[in-house]
Structure formats: structure tokens, C-alpha cells
Amino acid sequence: MGDRLLRAARGEVLDRPPVWMMRQAGRYMAAYRELQSKYTFKQRCEIPELAVEISLQPFRAFAPDGVILFSDILTPLEGMGIPFELVEHQGPIIDPPIRSQAQIERIRLLEPEESLPFIKTILSTLRREVEGKATLLGFVGSPWTLACYAVEGRSSKDYAHIKSLAFAQPPLLHQLLSKLADSIARYVIYQIEGGAQVVQLFDTWAGQLSPVDYECWALPYQKQIVDQVKARYPQVPLILYINGSAALLERVGKAGIDVFSLDWMSDMAEARARLGSLAVQGNLDPMVLLGSPEFIRQRTLEVIRKAGSRGHIMNLGHGIHPSTPEANVHYFFETVRQSAELIHLR
């Protein structure tokens, strides 16, 4: 059933949930590490043959119900006039960081056909490869999280620079976030037109905001993207992921998304009640996959049982840890595929 993930994202009741993993193409796989040793991260993201191969590695190994584009949330920034460097094992570096009116005014509206032609090539190739066997996912970064990188200049522990901008010069940050939202909306549409059937928005760092600041700095710009995309493609499900979302669950649906991707720090049953009619994705602690097969099965089935059969996509609550044994990943996928029978037998 190649459309299982698509059907779950639309809120349907299924015999068992579809399953994929955030960062399912990555360093935990020996096949990926072989390519990592030969090519830079930028090459792996932007050379279509490499990105397609990397995206398909976990599909061949584990047969997930979803295949996701191998890329990076910062990929569109260069097309907007925000250069960055991806440093292996350090993450992205934006130097100089974006902190002034003049810098924000120089940011261009993204023209993905011009600056990101490889993305459409990758997606269209993947769609042909997985058609009828899995759902193809695209993904983007959401404005608050992209702004965190742009303003801080790199990963941050306290987000001092962007919060200083928010609280001392709010019009400046609103201008930046709105520009980012318009460009990312274009990027989502471009991915859909390239073949993506579902698109996930990563607003990973929105969990660092208080509820009142989430409603000011993250939610409006998530909605700005969703509104523009839904005006063109109302039938395409959109997933939103926020790390550390426990304080925000009653608010995330206001963005107009179809599915909320839950981190592992919330109880699935309690989150379901708080999310209302939204479909849900998640939310196994990635570190569970470092445990014994029996423990992996127990915790996986517990999440599935609590989520229920309507509108649930099984996933981790964050990206898979690089040290995870591939055998444990295989066991996780097999457990989900057998979950209807296993839960019935318990």
C-alpha cells in the first residue's frame, strides 16, 4: 500500500500506521558513510545522483512507507542572498550573521527554479523510483528556525542574539521572518510540483519560545507559509515538527497544518487529547533504538497503542542517532509492520 502514509496524513483509519524515520538517510548506515568519505555534504545534497542514491538507501534496506528528500533546511538560503557554509560535524556557519536593517533589506525573494534546479531533478527521480511503493516527502525549514541560524550565525544554546532582536527591535525581526516565509512558501510549492506528496516543515527551535512568544514569532509565519501553499495545493498534507513542543500543543493547529510531529518528551495519549482532530506523527525516543529488541518492540507498540488507528504516522521524536545499529532499525520497522497483529496478541 504505497499511499499508506498519505492516507494517514489525511486522517484516515488504518490497520497499522505507516512508518518512516527523521534522518533515515544518514550516518548510522554504512552505505551512507562510504559516500560521506568521498563527497562533501554540499555535494551529497546538490548532486542529483548522490542525493537520490542517499534518499533510496534506507528505502532499499528497510522499506519505509515514506521516502524523504535528502537535503538540508538551509539549502534555499543562498538563493535568497544568505551565504552559508556547512562544516562537517560542526553544522552550518553563517558569517556575517544577519542582524541589521541593511542586511535584511538585501535578502531576495527565492526563485527556486533558478537557484535550486537540482531539487526538482532529485524529487522527480525519487517519485519515479518509489511510485506505488512509498509516499515521497519533501521538507523545509520554518522561518523562526531559519532565522535562528541566520541571526545567531551558527547553532546556539541560549538564542541570545535573535531574542535580543525580537525584544529590542521587533519590527526588524518581523520583516526578516515575513521575507523568509514568502520564500519558503515558494520552496514548498516548488517541491510539490517536483513530485513531493507530503511536505514537512521543521520549526525545530520554536520549542525554545514561551507560548506567548511562539504566537508572536513562530506561529504567524508558519501560517503564512501554509496559507500560500494551501491556496495552490489544498490536497497536499503539511506536517509541522517542533522539538520541545509540550507547552505549545493547543496552539500548533492554528498554523493550518494537517499533521503535527511530536517529540518524545510528551506522552502520546495526552498529546492526542490536546491536539484535537490533528493527525499526529511520532514519537519514539530515538535512543530507544539503542536498546534490546524486546525493549524496542515494547516501546514501539506502546506508542502505536496510545496513538490509536486514526491519522497516525509512526516515527521517532527526533532524528535517528548516528550510533544506532542498522539491525535495530530493521527490527523497529518490522515491529511497526506487524503491529496490528502484535497489539492484538498482547
UniProtKB/Swiss-Prot annotation:
Disulfide bonds: none annotated. Signal peptide: none annotated. It catalyses: uroporphyrinogen III + 4 H(+) = coproporphyrinogen III + 4 CO2. It is found in: Cytoplasm. One of its GO terms (cellular component) is cytoplasm. SUPFAM superfamilies: UROD/MetE-like. Homodimer. This is Uroporphyrinogen decarboxylase. It comes from Synechococcus sp. (strain JA-2-3B'a(2-13)). The gene is hemE.
